[in-house]
């Protein structure tokens, strides 16, 4: 899980979702998991 000011989709499997006010990237590749904060 990377915590970044700017979350971007890294590959075609990355999906940007908003969970309880927090922007997250979920992906099949666990290295691509990100959270905005």
Curated annotation (Swiss-Prot):
Q: Which UniProt keywords apply?
A: Ribonucleoprotein, Ribosomal protein
Q: Name one Pfam family in it.
A: Ribosomal_L36
Cited InterPro entries: Ribosomal_bL36 (IPR000473), Ribosomal_bL36_sp (IPR035977)
* GO cellular component terms, A-Z: cytoplasm; ribonucleoprotein complex; ribosome
Output the GO biological process annotations, alphabetical, semicolon-separated.
translation
Task: Name the Gene Ontology molecular function terms of this record.
Answer: structural constituent of ribosome
Instruction: Please give the family membership noted in the entry.
Output: Belongs to the bacterial ribosomal protein bL36 family.
Which PANTHER family does its entry note?
50S RIBOSOMAL PROTEIN L36, CHLOROPLASTIC (PTHR42888), LARGE RIBOSOMAL SUBUNIT PROTEIN BL36C (PTHR42888:SF1)
Spell out the protein name for this chain.
Answer: Large ribosomal subunit protein bL36
Q: Which organism is it from?
A: Ureaplasma parvum serovar 3 (strain ATCC 700970)
């Amino acid at each position: 899980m990377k915590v970044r000011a700017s979350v971007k989709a890294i590959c075609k499997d990355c999906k940007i979702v908003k969970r309880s006010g927090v922007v997250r990237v979920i992906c099949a590749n666990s290295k691509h998991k990100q959270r905005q904060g």
